[in-house]
A protein has these predicted regions:
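Histidine-centered divalent-metal-coordination microenvironment in nucleic-acid enzymes
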Residues: 1-8
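C-terminal accessory/tail domains of diverse enzymes
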Residues: 7, 15-230
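Active-site-proximal loop/hinge segments that shape catalytic or ion-binding/gating pockets
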Residues: 11
Length: 230
């Protein structure tokens, strides 16, 4: 999910050519609520076979620029104000389009099982949470990484980072702990949160990943049962 924060028709993600405080506060909120956002974006057991270390999918709660080992990625360099279309097509006239309006950040954990309505509402709640956190900028600084965290030389940094849940059962536990943030201002009703938690726990998959990791036959059965989205 790529997102940007708009105000009066203007993108608020950049200021003076760098990521703005507004953007970094929103990212901090996503860092804090990332564990429970999986309850909306990773909703069946096969989701957690994707969220494993050393793959393209994220497992650690961190963010960075153009870095595919992070959970929240800041893509491209829209702050450069370069008309890439004109560079690729030199006979075309420059568009004079303000490319800084395109700057987004990407939440990389959700997959095809996501309930999009709940997910987008949850991400909006997380961004709002970041605006309300007095230490949001410190959280953003602490969770920023500019290296591949899966390389051996960066293992000390990796150890400092929290991890995403590894099952629907763990995701349900995270949502239960953080539910107050989503119920605030009546964005999510308590009954809806209860229903999501109950559904996630119904899979009883707390140890499923380790149980089937060496069994291609069981893995295939799970894929056929749950991999029906997207």
């Amino acid at each position: 999910i790529h997102m940007r924060i708009m105000k009066d028709g203007k993108n608020q993600m950049l200021k003076d050519g760098v990521l703005s405080e507004t953007a970094r506060k929103a990212i901090a909120g996503m860092m804090e609520l990332a564990p429970s956002i999986t309850a909306f974006g990773n909703t069946n057991p096969t989701s957690y076979f994707r969220l494993v270390p050393h793959q393209e999918a994220p497992t650690n709660i961190c963010w960075g620029d153009r870095n595919r080992s992070v959970l929240v990625r800041v893509p491209l360099g829209w702050s450069a104000k370069t008309d890439m279309c004109m560079l690729a097509n030199p006979l075309e006239a420059p568009s004079n389009y303000d490319t800084t309006q395109k700057q987004t950040v990407e939440m990389r954990s959700p997959d095809g099982s996501a309930d999009l309505y709940q997910l987008i509402a949850g991400l909006a709640v997380a961004c709002r949470r970041g605006f309300e956190m007095p230490d949001a900028l410190e959280v953003a600084d602490r969770t920023y990484v500019n290296v591949n965290i899966h390389k051996k030389e960066n293992e000390d940094k990796l150890k400092q980072l929290a991890q995403l849940p590894d099952s629907c059962a763990a995701s349900a536990d995270c949502l239960e702990k953080q539910r107050a943030a989503f119920e605030k201002y009546n964005v999510f009703s308590p009954a809806m949160i209860d229903g999501i938690i109950t559904k996630l726990r119904s899979y009883e998959d707390k140890t499923l990943r380790s149980e089937v990791q060496n069994s291609p036959e069981e893995m295939l059965k799970l894929m056929e049962k749950y991999f029906h989205c997207g």
